[in-house]
Structure formats: structure tokens, C-alpha cells
Amino acid sequence: MNGVFTVGDLKYLARTGRLSGTAAVIGNVLSIKPILRGNKDGYIVQYKKCRGRKSALNELISLVCNNIVEPEKQIIGIAHADAYEDSLYVMEENPENTSKVRGFINTSYDFCTGSHVGPDTIAMFFMGNDRELQGMK
């Protein structure tokens, strides 16, 4: 199982100690949106940095397309924290590889998880080759 996500505001990562306060302020001013994932050891690690929200959402879609295994047998999970419109965008923006999937499950984060990542967070979950995603920077 692979999971990739992006956050809307870096201050929530700073509040939980995953990012320094200075980096969060600078990142927010420059509209930098990190793409994060869980690694094999269960830690959240940065995969890539994107400039702007749409760029980050498109990168999530690209990661799923490039790493999904047997898409016709899969249901892709999408979780969001008050980002319903963005969750619809990633469902409808179907490149060739995700247009073959059986379907999507779209849900909102629970309060506990949502408080750690903040509003406008969106994640995608899928079965892939390995948790080491192709294209790792």
C-alpha cells in the first residue's frame, strides 16, 4: 500500500515538529507545497517540492499513474481535510493509467489526523510495486 499526500499550509507541519517554523513561513510565502509519503519504516518523508497547489495535485496524480500496479483491479483511496473540491479534481483528472481503475473512495480525514496535517490536505492511497516510489528525487 502506497500513500502520498500534500498539505495546504506548512504551519501545521511546523506545529507538530515535522518542519521548522522558519521553513514553514518561507515555504508559505513562496507557495511551496511538499509531496509527502510514508516510507517502509513508517515515517513521513518528503518526496518532492512543488510550487503551487495545482502543481502539487498534478504531481500526486502523476505519482499514482507511474506507480500503480494492475489499475483495473484497484480502487484508489482519497482522503482530504476540508478539500472536497480538490479531491474531486484528482478523481476527474484521469490520465490513461487511472482511467482504468475500478473506482475511487473519497472520504474526509478524522479530526485527530486532520489536526496534525491541517486543512486543505489531500492524500491518495493505492497498491503499488513498492513503497520506494519511482522517480524519487
What are these regions (language model features)?
Residues 1-137:
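Mixed-charge interfacial surface used for oligomerization/domain docking
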